[in-house]
Design a protein with these regions (language model features):
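N-terminal low-complexity, acidic/polar interaction/targeting segments
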Residues: 1-86
């Protein structure tokens, strides 16, 4: 994924976590660092910040392609955003 895509995903993750905190989840907004030199590590950093089930984490780990992992995480975050705003 591009740096812009990672930054957009980061923004969406912050929205999701903020909504979950408003609904009673006891956690703080994480600090993110998007490393333009190592986008793979940045994507994994984003993955670790999103509250998700063990099944979802395993699904992310099962993908061999970094692009597939990005798409899976992005779709997951978008799904949460859509459910929360409906």
């Amino acid at each position: 994924p591009s740096v812009e895509e990672l930054l957009q995903l980061q923004s969406n993750i912050k929205k999701v976590i903020s909504m979950l905190i408003e609904q009673g989840l006891d956690m703080q907004l994480p600090d993110f660092e998007i490393d333009t030199e190592s986008r793979i590590i940045s994507l994994w950093n984003l993955c670790t910040k999103v509250p998700m089930s063990i099944e979802m984490r395993n699904k992310l780990l099962s993908h061999n392609s970094i692009d597939d992992r990005f798409e899976e995480l992005n779709n997951y975050v978008q799904l949460i955003l859509k459910k929360s705003f409906n």
